[in-house]
């Protein structure tokens, strides 16, 4: 299956990644990625950019090397209330937001604690994607999270980085999450979670997992540029944007 979109990518701006935005975009262009989202970590992550960085993202051109560039963020969920480390004013300016749990920003809790954080985060209409939900450090009630994602029209990310060793033990959780999404008709988005340009667009591990559960193509958001743009527009994003 051909994937045209990668929305979970990082640059040197995040403090622990190794290539620039232009290097990421150039790599995307060379391998046929049509839409690249840049999603730096929110400011509570050590080494992450100042909040002004996110407020200034409109300076990034929409088209570079014939790749459409979306301006996003991987925001940190800070507590069981689902609060993010990005102010609402800035949230409203971004093209999309991935919301994730990171242990340097929120202590791993019980299944109930972790699930509550994700469920409450999804009450924020600015959140579009839940990031790396298969992380075994944060066990969750998968059925409850996937059901809430369907209710709130939030995409569930299946993270290739998690399956490539960055979060050991994620495979079984990710497979269960994928199966739950298939059963409930919840859309998923594949993310590379790239911290270097060479992994942009590489969904090899996720592809094998999705094949193993026979995931319907219509539930995968990375296959069609129009599908992801229409999804974000329906949520009030990309107001003055049109695919060329």
Curated annotation (Swiss-Prot):
GO cellular component, one term: cytosol
InterPro entries: Phosphatase_YcdX_put (IPR023710), PHP_dom (IPR004013), PHP_phosphatase (IPR050243), Pol/His_phosphatase_N (IPR003141), Pol/histidinol_Pase-like (IPR016195)
Positions in coiled-coil regions: none
Binding residues for Zn(2+) 1: 8, 10, 74, 193
Domain of life per record: Bacteria
NCBIfam families attached to this UniProt entry: PRK09248.1
Family per similarity comment: Belongs to the PHP family.
Protein name: Probable phosphatase CA_C0509
């Amino acid at each position: 299956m051909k994937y045209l979109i990668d929305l979970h990518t990082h640059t040197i701006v995040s403090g622990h990644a190794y290539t620039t935005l232009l290097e990421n975009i150039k790599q995307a262009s060379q391998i046929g990625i049509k839409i690249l989202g840049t999603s730096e970590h929110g400011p509570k992550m050590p080494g992450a950019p100042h909040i002004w960085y996110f407020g200034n993202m409109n300076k990034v051109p929409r088209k570079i090397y014939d790749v459409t560039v979306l301006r996003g963020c991987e925001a940190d969920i800070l507590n069981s209330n689902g609060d993010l480390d990005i102010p609402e004013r800035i949230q409203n300016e971004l093209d999309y937001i991935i919301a994730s749990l990171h242990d340097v920003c929120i202590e791993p809790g019980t299944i109930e604690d972790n699930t509550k954080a994700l469920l409450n985060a999804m009450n924020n209409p600015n959140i579009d994607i839940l990031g790396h939900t298969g992380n075994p450090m944060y066990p969750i009630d998968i059925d409850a999270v996937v059901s809430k994602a369907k209710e709130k029209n939030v995409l569930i990310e299946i993270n290739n980085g998690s399956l490539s060793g960055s979060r050991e033990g994620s495979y079984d959780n990710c497979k269960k999450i994928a199966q739950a999404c298939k059963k409930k008709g919840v859309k998923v988005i594949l993310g590379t979670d790239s911290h270097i340009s060479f992994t942009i667009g590489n969904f090899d591990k996720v592809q094998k997992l999705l094949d193993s559960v026979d995931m319907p193509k219509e539930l995968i958001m990375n296959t069609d540029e129009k599908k992801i743009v229409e999804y974000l527009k329906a949520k009030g994003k990309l107001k003055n944007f049109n695919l060329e």
